[in-house]
Amino acid sequence: MTDLSPVLTIDGPSGAGKGTVSRIVAARLGWHYLDSGALYRAVGVAASWADLDVSDPAALVRCAFDTKVEFDEAGEAGLRVLVNGVDATSELRLETTGALASAIAAIPEVRSALKERQRAFRQPPGLVADGRDMGTVIFPDAAFKVFLTASAEERAGRRHKQLMEKGVSVIFDDLLREIMARDARDAQRVVAPLRPAEDAVLIDTSGIGIEDVVQRVVGLLDSRTP
């Protein structure tokens, strides 16, 4: 990579808090933000709109190449995502979209198709990259790497609370099973399995508030910046 802009990677399983933490840290640093999960979800949405068969890897790879995805960075408040020019932000956060994105992400050719698109986010003054393989595959040379984790029960509880606050009725045990199944898929896939980079700082977010986690991450950057 010719662009030496600093990169902070924040990886971890679904529900560990990496999205919220990454957005806040990026906003406070004034850096760009990459939500790699949103990129895979965007491809999932496009595939759903086109009624593609998830068992047809060739069609999904074409979809990954052809889908136009635009991120509207909105600071700490969140991220607006346009898929082929259409605002798909709300659809990206559906549980069904997450499951589809996880299945699509397991296809090596899709991951390869999206690799350079993700690396293109590395621009001055810096980038906070949130995902599952940011520190191991996409930005292995990143100066700052963090891996957030939490128990499956903790993560299911957070998701249950989020959905209930939005008026969505869900069963906790169903969410827990979905999270455990996704953990297994992410950890067992052949290409870029979910695991911490060897030089990543591990932070267990169980029982810790978001602001405390943000402070730890920002403190890491401060301690390693000359």
From Swiss-Prot:
Top enzyme class: transferase
SUPFAM superfamilies, A to Z: P-loop containing nucleoside triphosphate hydrolases
Location relative to the cell: Cytoplasm
Keyword list, A-Z: ATP-binding, Cytoplasm, Kinase, Nucleotide-binding, Transferase
GO molecular function (one): CMP kinase activity
Main location: cytoplasm
Catalytic activity line of the entry: CMP + ATP = CDP + ADP; dCMP + ATP = dCDP + ADP
Keyword check for Cytoplasm: yes
The EC number(s) this enzyme carries: 2.7.4.25
Entries under CDD domains matching the protein: CMPK
Entries under InterPro entries matching the protein: Cytidylate_kin, Cytidylate_kinase_dom, P-loop_NTPase
GO terms classed as biological process: nucleobase-containing small molecule interconversion; pyrimidine nucleotide metabolic process
Keyword Cytoplasm found: yes
A GO-annotated cellular component: cytosol
Pfam short name (any one): Cytidylate_kin
Residue numbers binding ATP: 12-20
Family: Belongs to the cytidylate kinase family. Type 1 subfamily.
HAMAP family reported in the protein's UniProt record: Cytidyl_kinase_type1 (MF_00238)
The protein's name in its UniProt record: Cytidylate kinase
Species the sequence originates in: Xanthomonas campestris pv. campestris (strain ATCC 33913 / DSM 3586 / NCPPB 528 / LMG 568 / P 25)
